[in-house]
Amino acid sequence: MRVVLIVLLFPVIALAQQGAKPAAGLLTEKALSLDMAMDIARGALDKCRADGYRTTVAILDTGGNLKISLRDDGTSPHTVEVAHKKAYTALIYRRPSMETAKAWATQVPPPSIDGTIALGGGLPIRAGDQVVGSIGVSGAPGQDKDEACATAGIAAAAARLK
């Protein structure tokens, strides 16, 4: 009797280990944890500091909500808003904010979408093909330098974003 009971329990245990599947009509998506957002922000800030720049870094979640913002000592107050706008621009267009700035430069008048900015330094954060957030950096002497710091931030968590 025990052998029969054990044999009958194997399929039940196997099904239980597969985990619950989402109900029809529900989506599941990856999301940045606070720890990962902090690591990305810190990686960007460290790169900027190593290059001699004092910057602000903003990380947004997929809903455009601020996950974390780091403002280095000695940065201008405006960098907080600009970093957020760069991250938001990268998030909603799902491309580097520098690409959006170049595209907008050819449009007269340029688009005016609340919360966006036509400056480089914002990047989408991807886990595989899925955008899981964005980063914006402001304060370095040049948009390309802001973007390099943002790239370094994402690289700091690249192994965990696969």
Which sequence ranges carry the predicted segments?
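Hydrophobic h-region of N-terminal signal peptides that target proteins for export
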Residues: 9-16
